[in-house]
């Protein structure tokens, strides 16, 4: 991921598409607002609109973003952080990849708390921090906020795997 410069902290949706394999309807992030390999942190953004497919059934008269999709957006932000850190943290694994494609895949979710609904018009801001790494597994603490208030928090585990 050396193509992403530490001096330019923002990554647009086209840059996100270069990092993550996710595509519609599961590409859930619109922008990376800030990131730091040194601090092991990332801040991502999801603009929640009424046009999201999941609002057709969740719930038609009271549209609420499903908690599992909030957690998925948190996992995607964490995966991007992992990819941006891969050349330093996972150099031994990257070298063994043999030219194949690797990405971070969700391996575990702990301590999830959904504190309030996320609705159309909200801007979901996700903050993740890598707290532990062993071999190909990393653990991150992540929160999702709307208007500065935490709407969801979780501890996420991801594995750096071939796909």
Curated annotation (Swiss-Prot):
**Where is the secretion signal located?**
none
Identify the catalytic residues. Answer: 58
Decide whether keyword Lipid biosynthesis is in the record.
yes
E.C. code: 4.2.1.59
One Pfam match, by short name?
FabA
Keywords on this record?
Cytoplasm, Lipid A biosynthesis, Lipid biosynthesis, Lipid metabolism, Lyase
Provide the reaction this enzyme catalyses: a (3R)-hydroxyacyl-[ACP] = a (2E)-enoyl-[ACP] + H2O
Q: What is its main location?
A: cytoplasm
Entry's Gene Ontology cellular component terms:
cytoplasm; membrane
Q: Which GO terms describe its molecular function?
A: (3R)-hydroxyacyl-[acyl-carrier-protein] dehydratase activity
List the subcellular locations.
Cytoplasm
Kindly report, in one word, the top-level EC class recorded for this enzyme: lyase
Q: Output the SUPFAM superfamilies linked to this UniProt entry.
A: Thioesterase/thiol ester dehydrase-isomerase
Q: Which cysteines are joined by disulfide bonds?
A: none
GO BP annotations listed: fatty acid biosynthetic process; lipid A biosynthetic process
Which family does this protein fall into?
Answer: Belongs to the thioester dehydratase family. FabZ subfamily.
Its function? Involved in unsaturated fatty acids biosynthesis. Catalyzes the dehydration of short chain beta-hydroxyacyl-ACPs and long chain saturated and unsaturated beta-hydroxyacyl-ACPs.
Q: What is this protein called?
A: 3-hydroxyacyl-[acyl-carrier-protein] dehydratase FabZ
The species this protein belongs to is Francisella tularensis subsp. tularensis (strain SCHU S4 / Schu 4)
